[in-house]
């Protein structure tokens, strides 16, 4: 971890206060490669993270209900919902288990019951041509599991995937407006069923939108962020607690429909091309002044 960070010293656009801050590990995302919940010592590992006041964001694909039922308290529990129907899920995920759909349904039931104390989040990664249809079936899953929040994100193109059965191109990557349209339709379907959800926050730069249970709307303001010190305080108290016990108010710039669209106004985007033009303009101005002095 530290070796990777050190390589960034001196890179244009790096803020030194952020660079120094990165040497203090604060969050751990248990995701990306493999299935973390299938690791036999996952609870012990999460406990080790918490002892160091490192938050735990665990992502699972809802294929191991027994392991999910035994999972200890984590800061946030993600469940990847990759497709809305059995047919589509088989196409997208190419699951190893023949009873993959039954496993998924069991995990959704566990979220609503045994793991209802957790801060649970559905994660939907939208891929055009694969999983952006059938809003009603997605709503069925939400109604069954009752997650705390639903995070919808447009897929990011990482190069060609030819040869793996699902060749993706830029044509499969949705625009932000397409993601917004999907979320608005899903939200409308949820509300038509009497489910107490609404669109809470967005980060347009990441093509990401958050739908949340309205219980996170406190005194007229969304509280979808996490109060990390409070989480560890509650954890160390030994008392039982739920997702609402460690919430933090959502910044105004992150709220759905805000002018900032999720971009923190305290940050500035580093534009390499703009920086080059700026430096060139400075050099040209200096050369002009030098020429005038010589004349």
PLM regions with names:
Residues 5-189:
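Conserved AdoMet/S-adenosylmethionine-binding subsite of the radical SAM
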Residues 112, 130-295:
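Auxiliary Fe-S-binding modules of radical SAM enzymes
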Residues 1-3:
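Low-complexity, serine/threonine/proline-enriched polar segments
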């Amino acid at each position: 971890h530290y070796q990777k960070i050190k390589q960034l010293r001196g890179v244009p656009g790096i803020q030194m206060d952020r660079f120094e801050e990165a040497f203090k590990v604060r969050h751990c995302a248990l995701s990306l490669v493999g299935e973390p919940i299938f690791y036999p010592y996952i609870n012990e590992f999460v406990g080790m993270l918490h002892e160091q006041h490192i938050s735990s964001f665990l992502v699972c694909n809802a294929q191991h209900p027994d392991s999910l039922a035994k999972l200890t308290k984590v800061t946030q529990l993600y469940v990847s919902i990759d497709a809305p129907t059995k047919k589509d899920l088989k196409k997208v995920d190419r699951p190893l288990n023949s009873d993959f759909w039954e496993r998924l349904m069991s995990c959704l039931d566990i979220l609503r019951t045994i793991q209802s104390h957790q801060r649970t989040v559905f994660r939907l990664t939208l891929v055009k041509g694969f999983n952006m249809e059938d809003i009603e079936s997605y709503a069925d899953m939400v109604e069954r599991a009752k997650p705390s929040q639903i995070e919808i994100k447009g897929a990011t193109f990482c190069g060609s995937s030819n040869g793996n059965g699902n060749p993706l191109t830029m044509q499969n990557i949705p625009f932000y407006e397409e993601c917004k349209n999907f979320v608005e339709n899903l939200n409308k379907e949820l509300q038509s069923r009497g489910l107490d959800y609404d669109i809470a926050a967005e980060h347009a730069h990441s093509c990401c939108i958050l739908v949340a249970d309205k219980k996170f709307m406190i005194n007229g303001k969304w509280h979808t962020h996490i109060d990390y010190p409070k989480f560890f305080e509650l954890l160390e108290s030994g008392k039982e607690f739920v997702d609402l016990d460690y919430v933090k108010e959502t910044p105004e710039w992150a709220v759905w429909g805000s002018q900032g669209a999720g971009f923190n106004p305290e940050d500035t985007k580093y534009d390499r091309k703009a920086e080059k033009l700026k430096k060139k303009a400075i050099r040209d101005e200096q050369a002009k002044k030098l020429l005038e002095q010589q004349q």
